[in-house]
Amino acid sequence: MSVPATSDLTTLRAAYASGATTPEEVAREAMRRAEDTSRHPHVWIERLDPERVMAFVRALPAEPGLPLYGVPFAIKDNIDLAGIATTAACPGFAYIPTDSATVVERLIAAGAIPIGKTNLDQFATGLSGTRSPYGAPECVFHPEFISGGSSSGSAVAVAAGIVSFALGTDTAGSGRVPAAFNHIVGHKPTRGLWSCRGVFPACRSLDCPTVFALSCHDAGAVLEVLAAWDQADPFSRKAPEERPSFPDHFRFGVLRPSQREFFGDAAAAALYEEAIVRLASCGGEPVEFEYGPFAAAAALLYAGPWVGERRWAVGHFFDTHPDGMHPVVRQVIGAADKYDAVAAFEAQYRLAGYAQATRETWEAVDLLLLPTTGTIYRRDEILSDPVQLNSNLGWYTNFVNLLDLSALAVPAGFRENGLPFGVTLMAPAFHDQALLALGSRYHRALGGAAGLTGVRIEEQPLAPEPPDGILLAVVGAHLRGQPLNTQLTSRGARFIRETRTAPGYRLYALPNTTPAKPGLVRAPGFDGPGIELEVWSLSQAAFGSFVAEVPAPMVIGSVELADGSVVKSFLCEPYATEGAEEVTAFGGWLAYRRSLGA
């Protein structure tokens, strides 16, 4: 057996399916790469010891059925992993959590293997990657240039091919800027779509966990695992049942020439023009828009009372450990003292005005295409002018969470000096899957390698389009490989994903049914394991003809999924469960059938 040279999900899945390698071998190779700091120093704050990593490997099932089975990943060190210190790049502030963050729990449950905790700008405050006592990660293409921040180590770990994907966070652009500087994908989901429980906050009302990946396809696989409502996070939001999509011929907003700011970087300006042409080749029409209200909203993030949220997050540590913080971070957070409650409300009112002003833009376009940053800086430049140059890096990023947008950072080519440039696709909330689908077509049109890896983007699968029909959940004989699945496929139904119901459902094996069928019944107040199911998409006509054939005691109703969304689903009339065997404990119909040897 041998470990694949690249760790993109498509390659790993094929290697596992063929038996060419095992999760243990892949995890050991990821650990070996992580330990080699000669080319990419300062990536890690803590690498997990081999025994801890192998414990995650041993917990995997024998067969590779989980969506992220055996996929190595990294965790930004402001996100909790149970039993491992969370430092937020501030050693004196470190704590050891007893529970993992919700996003980490869900990734591990989906089969992913954590390798370690990555470096960041202290307290996730900065876009440069240079504000850490653990050193400054470098751009993978040139050691004199910054990696971007604050999720610096996570981006480098992916771009260098150490792990398949990595978690970051994003308040002002921390999940996008490092992607641009290292020629990879950075997806910042809709605010609240991924849980922030167990994520140490920068601005709690704005923060988003993010993912760095080699392709939009891989980022989409992580999205499917993490896009779920979390009752333990008061900022969690339920996604709409119908996922928004872009039309075949879409309109995308581009900056007016007079409003383009590249800070003297002519190469970046030229690459932005090329990106506009490239996205137009994917079926889009560029439309110039007024950037003023977006820029005004961006200015509020640091020149406004939202820095008070950063001060709240750090708490008494700010006052009791004056020498325990990076001096620039302390300066930024200390600015909170300038704002009072009146200023906070005034800023909220101004933001509402800016958001109102952007509506004219959203009536004219489906999405925006902006530079991720106007330029890139050498490390010595940032160190000599840390505040102003950091502000320059946020020129096109700081407004995104304030205005409740979803965003996808994708590569956009290289300057003549070999440094990468990136652009960001932005759309209103909950357009995440649509952005990834369009972004993967754009990325494929660009082609080339992802980061420093050998992964060829033009050979990567496209991220799936949002479903355009009626979503239907099936739990038994209509599952893939089961006797009645052809009733779906013959109607052109499209498989969307595997997931579970919310906890409040029971499953029964119905007697005297041919083929054998389960009955799913809602049980309010029941804290069950959730029942495994598949979600399919059917056209309205196909859905109507399908429902017409559903026999009693089966009915089509609505079911709540684990992510809080609601779809149409098979359910069972309660009378049919009288005397039936309850099989809820198996967690799903297939597990129950396997227990019978069927």
Specify the residue positions occupied by each region the protein language model found.
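Glycine-rich, small-residue loops and helix-cap segments
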Residues: 19, 70, 109, 163-164, ...
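Gly/Ser-rich, acidic/histidine-flanked active-site/gating loops
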Residues: 5, 70, 82, 208, ...
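Gly/Ser-rich catalytic/binding loops embedded in alpha/beta enzyme cores
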Residues: 2-171, 277, 282, 488-489
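Compact nucleic-acid interaction/catalytic patches
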Residues: 469, 480-506
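Short glycine/serine-rich loop segments
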Residues: 100-101, 105-226, 401-424
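Acyltransferase
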Residues: 20-28, 58, 264-290, 315-320, ...
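A short helix-breaking turn/cap at a secondary-structure junction
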Residues: 188-270, 274, 293, 320, ...
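Short helix-loop capping/hinge segments that flank enzyme active sites or metal/cofactor-binding pockets
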Residues: 68-90, 247-255, 305-359, 364, ...
